UniProtKB/Swiss-Prot annotation:
Coiled coil: none
Classification via Gene3D superfamilies: Aldolase class I (3.20.20.70)
InterPro entries: Aldolase_TIM (IPR013785), TAL/FSA (IPR001585), Transaldolase_1 (IPR004730), Transaldolase_AS (IPR018225)
Alphabetical list of HAMAP family matching this protein: Transaldolase_1
Gene (name only): tal1
Protein purpose: Transaldolase is important for the balance of metabolites in the pentose-phosphate pathway.
Protein name stated in the entry: Transaldolase
Species in which this protein is naturally found: Schizosaccharomyces pombe (strain 972 / ATCC 24843)
Any GO MF annotation of the entry: transaldolase activity
Family (UniProt): Belongs to the transaldolase family. Type 1 subfamily.
Modified residues (Phosphoserine): S268, S269
EC number: 2.2.1.2
Length: 322
């Protein structure tokens, strides 16, 4: 049995992390996740030119100013990719709200509702879509409101326990705690390597998983952003893992053992203290601000996603003006 099959056998749901949907079918993932960087990368590939053209044609038909058409084409392109992905995976696709709205609760809510409307116009129900939102205080508040409306959310760029606690209290459907980016920070800061067992990203996700299970939170923990298969194996048994096609391929080609490492039933006996952040913004900000890694990684993550979204807009603008 391949390492990938063994991972699935531990109870972990495997998700594909890519916009390049042609590369995922053979791994039989349950869900797929996208982000602006992945959509940008896929949009540059010749085999996806038709999707970009379809989004541009859709925006041209809607008319309006060039800036208005760019926004229409941008949102439409997310739906074009999402729709194609949902023809391959049986579960859900995650589609991200523009990172520039990461500190704007109301606009995030409005964008999410709009994306869901676009999907529903294509005959895709909201139960098959997760709206990805950065795990800022404002983003978590937006997600709380959206979940109450039946719009399911994936809270991303999650680097700290503080963010994770607030997300659980907001009853969000799923969180994406990043593993590899946490490792990147500590490797650079401390100028050393880490084994998979001591990997700070692995430790972070394990702690969040155990806290959620101990206190009965329903929010799904989906580890994300991996640098190697060692990190993935250390999280076997976690609810979900979203994995790039390159690492899925490594797992598929390996027969190394993948024993279950995380077990919800064992969390109940752990001596953990319950804390609260959702309705205490000063406490959230103070405790989050005391985690240098989380502050740096959230900031650079939002900036990088926003930059790639702007690059995508530039590509769409050129096509709209052609």
């Amino acid at each position: 049995m391949s390492s990938l099959e063994q991972l699935k056998a531990t109870g972990t749901v495997v998700v594909s992390d890519t916009g390049d949907f042609e590369s995922i079918a053979k791994y039989k993932p349950q869900d797929a996740t996208t982000n602006p960087s992945l959509i940008l990368a896929a949009s540059k590939k010749p085999q996806y030119a038709a999707l970009v053209d379809a989004a541009v044609d859709y925006a041209k038909a809607k008319g309006g100013s060039i800036n208005s058409q760019i926004e229409i084409a941008f949102d439409r392109l997310l739906i074009e990719f999402g729709t194609k992905i949902l023809a391959i995976v049986p579960g859900r696709v995650s589609t991200e709200v523009d990172a520039r709205y990461s500190f704007d609760t109301q606009t995030t809510i409005e964008k999410a509702r709009h994306l869901i409307k676009l999907y529903e116009a294509e005959g895709i129900g909201r139960e098959r879509v997760l709206i990805k939102i950065a795990s800022t205080y404002e983003g978590i508040q937006a997600a709380k409101q959206l979940e109450e409306e039946g719009i399911h959310c994936n809270l991303t760029l999650l680097f700290s326990f503080v963010q994770a606690v607030a997300c659980a209290e907001a009853n969000v459907t799923l969180i994406s705690p990043f593993v590899g980016r946490i490792l990147d920070f500590y490797k650079a800061k401390n100028n050393r390597d880490y084994t998979a067992q001591e990997d700070p990203g692995v430790v972070s996700v394990s702690n969040i998983f155990n806290y959620y299970k101990k206190f009965g939170y329903k929010t799904i923990v989906m580890g994300a952003s991996f640098r190697n298969v060692g990190e993935i194996k250390e999280l076997a048994g976690v609810d979900f893992l979203t994995i790039s096609p390159a690492l899925l391929e490594q797992l598929n080609n390996s027969t190394d053992a993948v024993p279950k490492k995380l077990d919800a039933s064992k969390a109940s006996s752990l001596n953990l203290e319950k804390v609260s952040y959702l309705t205490d913004e000063p406490k959230f900000r103070f405790d989050f601000n005391n985690d240098e890694m989380a502050v740096v990684k959230l900031s650079t993550g939002i900036a990088a996603f926003a930059k790639d979204a702007d690059t995508l807009r530039t590509i769409l603008k050129a096509k709209l003006e052609a």
